[in-house]
């Protein structure tokens, strides 16, 4: 059985590299491991690539894994005067691919990252992507933005007046309390929540929470484009879904199954928002078994 390293060990075995995003150079953390078919794993909000720590040992035997931290998250740079956007995060993924020499890859996208993957899919459809996406696995995210149900803390952060004030005073206790309802009842989330907080608060990252939360507005602005990207693509898609998720759970699953009835869909009935943390064995099995 592979041992799962803690956050410091995770960072120690990755690297922080300078990538050009727009007109500026930004430091981005990436972790690569394994050998074989390329698989790019993209994390959610408000966490980091460490979300994949329980899966990586199971996947790396037959896959070359690439796991970046998005700008503003984890061990990546966290500029305080910045307009964060999902489009820029898609640029970041492209830059990570270019640096690693990736020509084709499968994508695994959770939460926040489902929109990044949808944008990359749209770019591929337009002939504007240099990397071939061979398949995408989506996990618990706002694929259909109008069905996304933000948690109270997220809504408060999105408010122009409250958001900066909350970012200025948020602490580990408030943060982990906000995460609590997103885990399944009975799941002991203490360790995972603590690690997510440590990744978030690195370099004072909690202070930009109100800037990162703008992804919700990005989804509203780009929703038509991103929905078309998944509903019109020939790229194999599959879904691994925690049905107890209060944010994007059973209600989102219903729409996905209605609009994409032929896509493989694994419903995890006892899992909430964090399939990779709550049910890593089942998620790994699905990723290794499905065609996407």
What kind of feature is each model-predicted range?
Residues 1-39, 60-63, 98, 102-103, ...:
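Alpha/beta-hydrolase fold catalytic core
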Residues 122, 126-166:
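Flexible "cap/lid" loop of the alpha/beta hydrolase fold
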Residues 173-188, 195-201, 212-218:
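Helix-loop "lid/cap" segments that line or gate small-molecule binding pockets
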Residues 205-258, 267:
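Conserved serine/cysteine hydrolase catalytic core
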């Amino acid at each position: 059985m592979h041992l799962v390293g803690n956050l410091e060990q995770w960072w120690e075995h990755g690297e922080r590299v300078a990538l050009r995003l727009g007109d500026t150079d930004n430091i981005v953390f990436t972790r690569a491991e394994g050998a074989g078919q390329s698989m790019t794993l993209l994390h959610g909000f408000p966490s980091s690539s460490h979300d994949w720590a329980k899966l990586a040992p199971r996947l790396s035997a037959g896959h070359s894994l690439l796991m970046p931290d998005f700008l503003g998250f984890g061990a990546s740079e966290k500029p305080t005067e910045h307009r964060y956007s999902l489009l820029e995060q898609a640029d970041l993924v492209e830059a990570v691919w270019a640096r690693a020499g990736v020509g084709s890859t499968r994508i695994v996208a959770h939460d926040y990252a489902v929109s990044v993957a949808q944008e990359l899919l749209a770019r591929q459809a337009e002939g504007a992507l240099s990397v071939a996406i061979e398949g995408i696995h989506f996990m618990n995210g706002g694929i259909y933005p109008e069905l996304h149900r933000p948690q109270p803390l997220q809504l408060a952060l999105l408010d122009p007046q409250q958001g900066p004030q909350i970012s200025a005073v948020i602490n580990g206790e408030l943060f982990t309390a906000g995460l609590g309802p997103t885990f399944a009842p009975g799941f002991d989330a203490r360790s995972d929540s603590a690690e997510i907080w440590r990744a978030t608060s690195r370099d004072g990252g909690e202070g930009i929470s109100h800037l990162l939360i703008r992804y919700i507005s990005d989804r509203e602005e780009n929703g038509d484009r991103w929905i078309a990207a998944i509903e019109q693509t020939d790229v194999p898609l599959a879904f691994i879904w925690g049905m107890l998720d209060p944010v994007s759970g059973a209600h989102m699953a219903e729409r996905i199954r209605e609009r994409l009835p032929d896509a493989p869909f694994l419903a995890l009935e006892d899992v909430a928002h964090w399939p990779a943390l709550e049910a890593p064995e089942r998620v790994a099995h699905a990723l290794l078994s499905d065609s996407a």
